[in-house]
Every structure is written in C-alpha cells, then in structure tokens.
C-alpha cells in the first residue's frame, strides 16, 4: 500500500500541491484527473522520488522508488541509442541481466532504430515496454494514452487489466475524463493543487459533472451563427 500524508509542494512562494491525502492499494487502478496545471505531473514526480516535498509518502513494500516504473508525459531518450539498447539499459538498472526483449516487444517496435527517431507515440510505447520489462510493483503513468493510436490505446488498456490482476499498484493521470473512466477503479479530482473529490467506479459521473462546471457555454457558438 502507498499512503500519502499531508503532501505539500511549492515552487518558491507558489503552492502547487496542498495537503494531499491519498491511499493506493495493490490490484487497483487509480486515476488522477484534472485540468492542465492542476499539479498532476508534480504529484507523480513526488511519488517517483524526483521532487522534494513536505509531508510523507509511506510504502509497505520497501523503498518506493526502487519498485516504481514512472512514465513521464514526454519520455527522454539518449542520443544515438536504439530501442533495443534503451530497453536493455532499463533492465540492467533493475539487475535483469538477460531479458528476452524481442519476445516482449508488445507494440512491434523497430528496436534496431534510434529511439530519438521514433514518433511521439512510438517513444511512449517504448517507454511503457521498458517499465514492464523491469517487473515493477508500482506503475505511475503520466498521460499514458496521449499521442498513441487507437489500437495501441487498446493494448495499453489490456496491459492495465493484466497488471491489476497481478496485484500491481497503478496510478494514471489525464486531463480528459473519457480516457480514464474505463480503465480506473477510483478517480481523484485534482484542482488547483487540492484533491477536491474521490469517487469509486459507478460514481465517476459526479466528477465529470463537476469538471464541466464553468466550461464553455455552447450557446455562445449557436449565437455566433445566428447573428
């Protein structure tokens, strides 16, 4: 289990996250939903051990960052490194010395090509493949469906189901409600650095309706064409 207690993060005098309290259990898929700038990426960086913060994060499985696979919104790749070399590097970091990389090339990527030449979607798929090969217990995926084609989205969704069955802890983010509603067991609505609402599956519409509040009044569009 991962337990976040009173997590607060500021950049200078600007508060990004304020008094976050959350719990994540194995075998559950949690979604962090919120508009751009709500603090989702900062929260994920805190969980992944990449940002300092006030408060605490407890994990009963050992050192959290040693068990965590983190997918950033835009994965980073070293220059002149092939897809195969990238995956091997990630495996070596977890002391997985002889990974069967070709067997687990789920997205049929051209692993002999330089990763930096991949499209945005291909790079994201390569990064996800690397996290799976590492055999992580916790998966923190920042906007995993963005920039990926429909068929690959379906594969990612199936991967999430399998990881859930294997009792892994999965935390996703998105600023688009529809990308999370089918994959997640719980949704946490993050707004202006605060968790405004948490809902279990079956009650997600409550969050969707709250997110719609204050959005564009479509009557404005109609009035443009009627004037």
Where are these regions (language model features)?
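Conserved structural motif at the start of ABC-family nucleotide-binding domains
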Residues: 2, 17-19
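The feature captures the beta-strand-to-loop junction immediately N-terminal to the Walker
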Residues: 33-35
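Conserved ABC transporter NBD signature motif
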Residues: 52-66
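Hydrophobic anchor residue at the start of the ABC signature
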Residues: 128
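Catalytic Walker B motif of ABC-type/P-loop ATPase nucleotide-binding domains
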Residues: 139-143
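Helix N-cap at the start of a conserved alpha-helix in ABC-type nucleotide-binding domains
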Residues: 150-151
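H-loop/switch region of ABC-family ATPase nucleotide-binding domains
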Residues: 173-175
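Conserved beta-strand-loop-alpha-helix hinge in the C-terminal portion
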Residues: 194-218
């Amino acid at each position: 289990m991962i337990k976040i207690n009173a997590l607060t993060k500021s950049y200078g005098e600007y508060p990004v996250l304020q008094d976050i309290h959350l719990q994540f259990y194995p075998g559950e898929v949690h979604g962090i939903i919120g508009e751009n700038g709500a603090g989702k990426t900062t929260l994920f960086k805190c969980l992944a051990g990449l940002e300092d913060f006030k408060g605490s994060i407890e994990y009963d499985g050992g050192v959290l960052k040693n068990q965590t696979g983190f997918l950033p919104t835009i994965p980073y790749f070293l220059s002149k490194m092939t897809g195969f070399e990238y995956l091997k590097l990630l495996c070596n970091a977890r002391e997985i010395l002889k990974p069967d990389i070709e067997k687990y090339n789920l997205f049929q990527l051209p692993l002999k090509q330089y990763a930096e030449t991949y499209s945005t979607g291909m790079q994201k798929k390569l990064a996800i493949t690397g996290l799976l090969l590492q055999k992580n217990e916790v998966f923190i995926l920042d906007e995993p469906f963005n920039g990926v084609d429909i068929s690959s989205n379906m594969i990612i969704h199936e991967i999430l189901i399998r990881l859930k069955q294997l009792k892994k802890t999965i935390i996703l983010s998105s600023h688009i409600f529809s990308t999370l509603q089918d994959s997640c067991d719980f949704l946490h609505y993050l707004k202006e650095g605060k968790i405004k609402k948490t809902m279990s599956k079956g009650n997600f519409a409550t969050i969707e309706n709250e997110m719609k509040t204050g959005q564009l009044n479509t009557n404005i569009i109609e009035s443009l064409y009627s004037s």
